[in-house]
């Protein structure tokens, strides 16, 4: 089963083979992404081990959403020992997010 994931916007998009699912996970992405994926696998009579490859929409987009999504797909691909592809179809060893602007991180206090 091919898995596609896009966490670049507040609405998460998950593809499983030819089916597409959307969920407004937004600020709850980190807490609920694994369960969202697992629930959809179960709906399709599948399990984690049935995933044969992963494609990830690596950006541009939300800093936090891309960071969380990239961490999840990188971990899944590594654990399941399956191929990982960026949104352009390139097989990659690791997803590196493409942010739409520099991260707004405050300077450290002196």
Residue ranges of predicted features:
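DPxDG-like acidic metal-binding loop motif
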Residues: 53-58, 63-82
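Oxyanion-binding and handling regions
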Residues: 1-49, 78-110
């Amino acid at each position: 089963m091919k898995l596609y994931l896009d966490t670049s916007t507040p609405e998460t998009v998950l593809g499983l083979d030819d089916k597409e699912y959307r969920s407004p996970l937004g600020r709850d992405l980190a807490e609920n992404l694994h369960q969202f994926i697992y629930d959809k696998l179960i709906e399709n009579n599948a399990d984690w081990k049935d995933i044969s490859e992963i494609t990830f929409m690596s950006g541009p987009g939300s800093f936090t959403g891309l960071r969380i999504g990239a961490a999840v797909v990188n971990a899944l691909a590594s654990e399941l020992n399956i191929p990982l592809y960026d949104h352009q179809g390139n097989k990659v060893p690791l997803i590196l997010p493409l942010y739409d602007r520099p991260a707004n991180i405050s300077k450290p206090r002196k």
